[in-house]
Amino acid sequence: MNNIVHKLKTLVLNEAFGGVLLIVCTLLALLVQNGSFSEHYREFLNLKVGFSVGEFELNKPFLLWINDGLISIFFFAIGLELKKEFLHGDFKNPKNIVLPFMAALGGILIPAMLFVLVNIGDAYTLKGWAIPTATDTAFALAILMMCGKHIPSSLKIFLLSLAIFDDVGAILIIAIFYTTKLSIVAFVVAGIAILAMLVLNILGITRKSFYFICSVILWISVLKSGVHATLAGIITAFFIPMQTKNGEAFLEEIYESLKFWLAFVILPLFAFANAGVNLSNIDIGAIFSGVSVGIFLGLFVGKQAGVFLFSYLAIRFKFAALPQGSNLKQLYGVCILTGIGFTMSLFIDGLAYEVSDIFNYADNLAILIASFCSGIWGFIYLKFFATRS
């Protein structure tokens, strides 16, 4: 019996299994949204959930709690893993930071340029220039893990690091170009929460409840500030101490405790909530419109080209080095996966066009097709063409 339990636990925490679960939830969402349960699916996502304390009230649809709340925990876990790398891993050398930064920069500039070139002259369509700049880290990482053990773990760290810079870029883009109103008061409260965690860290305090309270205050204030709330998860991770005063692992313990919830609850729920695109509303004839072509070229061509080009230049001119144990073929394979914009691109699309159906949902279809092509081609390339030699 114990052997069976051990095998089940190993399966659940296996990252490849997590990737399969994400794909299953994605297909399930598409089936439900386009089947007889579509009305219940939408009601579930639009269900208002919240609380109030005095005059303060936070009452949002369940979809927001998933996208801004639960997924913040995912980015918190990413932040924890990155902190380990910065302090005790490859990123202890500042030179190793250059590569993911340059890769993310190329992955933002080139897709945006392609979209603008295709849609130049159409002011309204150009509002969506940032759609192909996004990467759905959860899906990209899941597919990378499904490629097997012949892919070096350093490439996983590279993708995660790239994702952080990519997400910061996305947050800045949203804050500057897609935010109508920023709250200074909320920013001040966020600053106080960050300062409190800094003090806790300096004093070496390792009471989880203290960090939890500060992180909740930070998350709410960032949410209210008008900036995407997932940034709170990354910021919180950077203030978690590596170990207790007695030398016991503190950060590692928190990270390990999150693995089950990430694999079995958070990421599958995120996929199920965001993948439900109503295919019946899509006008196939509009798939060759400027917005659709711009999105497809930006994600499937621009992302991999931009990320790889800027990475190659950084390596060629010796500003950076290849991730340990990897080669250019494997690096290019990871670059392909960055074209999986999926949920993040759908999110920015909703901000850019204010959830309008002016394009008959052809923009949504373009995101799905480009993400699907990037995922399939990236998996095939990494699995069968990219080798260590």
Swiss-Prot record:
GO terms for cellular component: plasma membrane. It is found in: Cell inner membrane. GO terms for biological process: regulation of pH. GO terms for molecular function: sodium:proton antiporter activity. It is a multi-pass membrane protein. It comes from the Bacteria. It catalyses: Na(+)(in) + 2 H(+)(out) = Na(+)(out) + 2 H(+)(in). Keywords: Antiport, Cell inner membrane, Cell membrane, Ion transport, Membrane, Sodium, Sodium transport, Transmembrane, Transmembrane helix, Transport. The keyword Chaperone does not apply. The chain crosses the membrane at residues 12-32, 62-82, 97-117, 128-148, 157-177, 184-204, 220-240, 260-280, 282-302, 305-325, 331-351, 365-385. It holds the Pfam family Na_H_antiport_1. Na(+)/H(+) antiporter that extrudes sodium in exchange for external protons. PANTHER family: NA(+)_H(+) ANTIPORTER NHAA, SODIUM ION/PROTON ANTIPORTER NHAA-RELATED. Belongs to the NhaA Na(+)/H(+) (TC 2.A.33) antiporter family. HAMAP family: NhaA. This is Na(+)/H(+) antiporter NhaA 1. The lineage of its organism: Bacteria, Pseudomonadati, Campylobacterota, Epsilonproteobacteria, Campylobacterales. The gene is nhaA1.
